[in-house]
Design a protein with these regions (language model features):
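C-terminal region/appendage detector
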Residues: 1-209
Length: 209
């Protein structure tokens, strides 16, 4: 038999009578599936209400920022306050995770490097001849890039750190779906090209090398 892998936690009303479904749990909902759904909700919350500060996070300046409401799948509405600035700030200043009270089970991030520092270091590891092109041709992709103000913040920090004669340009699709799944979209376009068969390596060739 096909067993549903979901659960209901709300009240459903029909004509003439009310059915209270308060906590009906399907016995076959695995812990892994429950964790997957929890992370899916957390990702949506992150991409919906969180945003980067224009410059390095300042606790005093952000305390008066208005909170935003987020509706959970069960209908409950929560207010997200200054945390909506703190969470994305960890991309640039991961060492603040402890002072933000967001540590939990997170690994020690004292020596972790921020996004702009990682980008700068990787560009500087490349040949001098291509660095100018790399600074001027950065593309944001993936779900983590959906934070509002991320592109502007990254571009500003790299501009301050880059050589004075280099133009820094960070681009990102305005379409959230395209940005989130850019790698898959790019892969599908590449795979559809007639010349793609000349680019791949067979299993036999791979094993030979």
């Amino acid at each position: 038999p096909v067993k549903p892998r979901y659960e209901f936690k709300r009240t459903a009303r029909g004509d003439g009578e009310t059915f209270d479904v308060t906590d009906v749990k399907c016995p076959d909902v695995t812990a892994a599936y429950r964790l997957f759904k929890q992370r899916e909700i957390a990702s949506d919350l992150k991409e919906t209400v969180c945003r980067l500060s224009d410059s390095s996070y300042d606790d005093a300046a952000n305390q008066n920022m208005p909170s935003m409401q987020y509706e959970l799948p069960d209908g409950n509405v929560i207010d997200v306050g200054v945390e909506r600035y703190k969470i994305p700030e960890l991309l640039f200043q991961p060492e603040l995770v402890g002072s933000f009270g967001l540590g939990g089970d997170a690994p020690d991030l004292k020596n972790a490097k921020g996004l702009s520092q990682l980008v700068l270091e990787n560009i500087n590891r490349c040949d001098v001849d291509v660095r100018k092109d790399l600074f001027g041709g950065m593309l944001l992709a993936g779900g983590g890039s959906l934070f509002p103000q991320l592109r502007e913040r990254l571009e500003a920090e790299l501009h301050d750190a880059a050589p004075t004669n280099v133009r820094v340009k960070v681009t990102a699709s305005q379409n959230a779906i395209e940005r989130k799944f850019a790698t898959w979209i790019g892969g599908s376009i590449l795979a559809s090209l007639g010349s793609f068969q000349q680019m791949w390596m067979s299993k036999q060739e791979y094993e030979e090398h």
